[in-house]
A protein has these predicted regions:
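Compositionally biased terminal segments of proteins
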Residues: 1-158
Length: 158
C-alpha cells in the first residue's frame, strides 16, 4: 500500500506489534497506526479505496479483513501515538520489511490504555527484558505517564 501510494506510511502496533518483542500470545486482529489529515472533521480511512479495489471489502468487528486478519487502521492522533508512528523501526519478516512500533512506545501505550490485558503484557515486556528501562522512562515522562508508571511499579514490581 505504501509502495503504491495508497497510504503515506504505517506502523504495526497493538498485540501483533508486541509479538515482535515478546513470546507470542493470542490476538484477534492487527492494529496499524496511520496518519490522517488533522484538519478534517470526518476522517477517511487512508487506503480504503485501495483495499476495496483489491477485493478487501469485508468488515469484521472494527477491522477490514485482509488475508484472513481483521486489520484496524488506527489514526495516530495523540502525541504518544504520533511519536510511536514516527519512530517505528523496520523489521524483516520472511524478507519483507515491516515497520513496527518500538517496544518502549508499545509499553507506554499499554500503560496509558490500562486494560487488564495491557497490564499483563507490560509484565511480559519487563520480565523478558524486551524494553530498555531508561528509554521507556523517557517516553513515559515525555508523555505525562509518570503517575501511571509509579502506580504500576508499586502494584506489580514488588
Amino acid at each position: 500500500m505504501v509502495a503504491d501510494g495508497a497510504i503515506e506510511n504505517y506502523a504495526v502496533a497493538g498485540a501483533i506489534g508486541a509479538i515482535f518483542y515478546v513470546e507470542p500470545f493470542s490476538t484477534e486482529d492487527l492494529d496499524v497506526f496511520v496518519v490522517t489529515p488533522e484538519d478534517r472533521l470526518i476522517i477517511e480511512l487512508p487506503g480504503w479505496d485501495y483495499l476495496k479495489a483489491h477485493g478487501y471489502t469485508r468488515i469484521e468487528k472494527e477491522g477490514i479483513v485482509v488475508e484472513g486478519w481483521p486489520v484496524q487502521f488506527v489514526p495516530a492522533t495523540t502525541p504518544l501515538e504520533r511519536e510511536a508512528y514516527l519512530n517505528a523501526q523496520i523489521v524483516s519478516v520472511d524478507e519483507v520489511s515491516v515497520r513496527v512500533v518500538l517496544p518502549e512506545h508499545l509499553v507506554a501505550i499499554m500503560l496509558n490504555v490500562g486494560r487488564p490485558k495491557d497490564i499483563a503484557r507490560i509484565k511480559m515486556f519487563l520480565s523478558q527484558d524486551a524494553v530498555k528501562l531508561t528509554a521507556l522512562e523517557d517516553v513515559i515522562n515525555r508523555h505525562g505517564l509518570s503517575e501511571e508508571w509509579s502506580n504500576y511499579k508499586r502494584t506489580f514490581l514488588k
